[in-house]
Amino acid sequence: MSDKPVFSTAAAMDPAASIASSNKVLSNTYWLLGLTLAFSALTATISVAINMPPMMALVLMIVGFVLLFVVHKMADSAKGLPAIFAFTGVWGASIGPMLSVYLAMDNGPTMVLQALGGTALVFFSLSAYALNTKRDFSYLGGFLLTGLIVAVVAMIANIFLAIPALSLTLSAVIVMIMAGLILFDTSRIIHGGETNYIRATVGLYLNIFNLFIHLLHLIAVFTGGDD
């Protein structure tokens, strides 16, 4: 199989052709995003059903990080498609033990459904806003990256500090950062900043994945399920 960048669409000089190219990338991205999210949901469900041990979930998360680099390396070839499904499937399975904990709580299934619904509402609302306004949100990039780095460092520190209030604050901050990244990544596709729909899918998938996890944490805390 040739490594020709068949999954990228270069922007043309003609504005009309450039718009058509961006629309094609966006359409392909949404199709692939829907399929990978469905596959993640399937592997997460299987993980919950077999009661996957937390240690195995940690191993899968590490494997997922490795596969993330593989996806980016192979995104310009046909190998990128099986790579992205491997990545999203592994990451979906890795949250099985976490979901099992939430599902075992009072109103656990309701909380998970609320988090899913909230994630969908945020994603579709922000995507629609970016698509309808055609605003360029590239200016958010530096701010969002800085905020994400600070949040990750604080999360690592809180593993040892174990401060509940900090954990809650970080989840709220990450929800806002992911919302901003949805605007940023969608805007990049619209304006031709991202022409590879596999890479575009990975970006939006990660935004949705993290948005769901931290929204679920917030819902559990505010409904008394996660003290």
Q: Which role does the model predict for each range below?
A:
Residues 1-227:
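A hydrophobic alpha-helical transmembrane-helix feature that marks the membrane cores
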